[in-house]
Amino acid sequence: MSQAKRIKKDVDQEESQALNSLLDHLSKKYNISKDLILSSIPDAKKFDYDLKIYKINPQEIEDEIEAFKFNQTKDLITADEIFSIIKDIMANKNKEEKKLGNQTGKNKNISYQNAPAKKNNITINEKINVKYNTTVVYNEGGVEMEKQFNIMNPLLDVGNNFHLIEPYDLIPKDALIQKNGYQRYFSEIKDKFLRENEQYKDEKKPFDVFVLFLAFDVIDQKPTYDDLVGIDPLADFKKYILKINTNTDNIFLVSGQITYIEGNLVDNGKTIEVSKLKNIYEINEYSIPYKDVVQFYEKSSDPFAIYYMNGPYFSKDSKDFSVFNNVLKNVAIKNPHLFIINGPFFSTENEKVKWGELDTEEGMIDIIKKIKDEFIKTRTKILICPGISDNENFYPLPQPPFDKINNFFIGSKGNSEIIFISNPQIFPLNEAYIGIANFDVIKDIIVNSIHSSEINTVDKACEMILYQKNFYPVLPNTTVPKYENNQERVATVDLSQYNYLNFDRIETNPDIILTNSAMKTFAKKIHGTVFVNCGSFCKGNNYGEIAKITLHNPSKETKETDINKRVKVEFIKINQINNSKK
């Protein structure tokens, strides 16, 4: 009798629905047989019991598995590794419960505050023109879309002064204090917060007040609440130990999160007993009057159609662009208004690129020509955004547009159908703002966070972007490209340019944010912003999905103008497109 069958026989006849459901979920998700996962569990009865006691849900396990795969740079996971990850989750929860049992005193009822979203009315001029003094119209008889990009987010004009950052310690101080870098960014954020919140400057309060960014005093390890510290960049990066009670619902703290803190300074000024945490931005949701919105749709009754996809576009050990070319052809037939094509196009993780077997410069010229030829007779505007592993745009974030650094794009500059953008980027589309973050900020936030167990970490990661008004609110970033023998690494973010990742220049948060995460595909409404992740075009040797986003015209009957109530997101399997008639 196999080990799996012996274990099955030992388990009660009425095996719990929770265990069965979990095994079915993991088996289907990771393509491992249910029996094999069960065979890796030494004591299935105890495992079943612990699942109930610790209230472990499949999403929590899935998040940890994805983080493990990402950190280990693995595409697959074994049954033994799955069991080990679940065991670690149980151990951490047991540790937290013991810690809670020992905590007493004034720190018990800590207040973790995320202010409820406020909804206000705002005119179209207040939302767009006041900030950028530009016309943002696109319809069949309106202003051409490329005019919208003239004076947008300065990410378009950051120039070529980028450099890679050497391996770093917990707090890369030298990088943080450079011109226009994190120190200046932090100072502006703090001043703005205190200016707009006079009540927090009252020095007569019976507690101490701080504005700090959070960090974890460990590197390349899963942090715990014991590792939490607060850093003050404006006081020579002074570090405070933060004593925080974990008995709080909905808590989610990220390394790099700028936070207002109330508490008591103890231990000769080294430790803060935290009583209150608050994000430095509130999330404001806005409605634009119907009369301001309808002007964009008077000349066209068609819903606005957007397609977007993320590289890489061929497998790690291949150089075959035939599927990519076929998708271009099929999207061109659909004739959408906008097609967003994100890199990487020639990823440094591809073996043939890594060893110089491909001429990536000529390859990029061929790609641009192919895109131009396919869409030359359509109404479609093409946006091309680099990826952080692009061989022809190998800069840390924020990345400049391809045409800012590569002369070989001069020949296509006159083509009104193709527009090169930065990574990240915000641009206006009629009355909406769309943000593009072509990097795995969702996973990076989750990996660099501590949180209570009963939360949706993906939702909280999206929410953190909005509360920090920053496309990459993570510092230091531990998920960075690894090089030969995993000995050397460089930072994902150029910290001297960190202020360019902030989007507090716009009055509202973006209406739609497009991401590129290894997490499963999703479309989520988070406080009025629709987050869309379609994953990568090519995953290992398999093909993923692209996204179609439809923005419907405002209804004459309901006069509904909120973008998140008018948008529809569909994920289309690439194999389905490739197998259709060419």
Regions found by a protein language model. Give the residues of each.
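Extended recognition/assembly regions associated with phosphoester-bond processing machinery
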Residues: S2-K582
